[in-house]
């Protein structure tokens, strides 16, 4: 199957699962409406899909939410089968995704760095060496 079709199907799955979470149709109390589906990677034969989940909640609550989604995967898969026009609805695997939180932490670390050199001093020394 073409990569474009797989990416489009992954995006449709992401949107549908997000809608199920936001609408509260998943009754598991571990599944918070603050969970977000970052991306979905569908296998080439459409048999499997990896669903990457993150949240701004603490790591423990996010992992509990992922377990809740795993327990509700049958319901989610049935809902997807009704909405998507595919012969076989992929088997869903939910994965805790730390990449967004790690990215935010990295940006915060970079912003907290203090530079000991003054940019004006660097320009002044560069200009004097060019004049020689």
UniProtKB/Swiss-Prot annotation:
Subcellular compartments: Cytoplasm
GO biological process, one term: maturation of SSU-rRNA
Keywords recorded for this protein, A-Z: Cytoplasm, Ribosome biogenesis
Top-level taxonomic group: Bacteria
GO CC terms of this entry: cytosol
Single annotated GO MF: ribosomal small subunit binding
SUPFAM superfamilies: Ribosome-binding factor A, RbfA (SSF89919)
Family annotation (InterPro entries): KH_dom-like_a/b, RbfA, RbfA_dom_sf, Ribosome-bd_factorA_CS
Function: One of several proteins that assist in the late maturation steps of the functional core of the 30S ribosomal subunit. Associates with free 30S ribosomal subunits (but not with 30S subunits that are part of 70S ribosomes or polysomes). Required for efficient processing of 16S rRNA. May interact with the 5'-terminal helix region of 16S rRNA.
Family (UniProt): Belongs to the RbfA family.
PANTHER family: RIBOSOME-BINDING FACTOR A, CHLOROPLASTIC-RELATED
Quaternary structure and interacting proteins, as annotated: Monomer. Binds 30S ribosomal subunits, but not 50S ribosomal subunits or 70S ribosomes.
Protein name per Swiss-Prot or TrEMBL: Ribosome-binding factor A
Source organism per UniProt: Treponema denticola (strain ATCC 35405 / DSM 14222 / CIP 103919 / JCM 8153 / KCTC 15104)
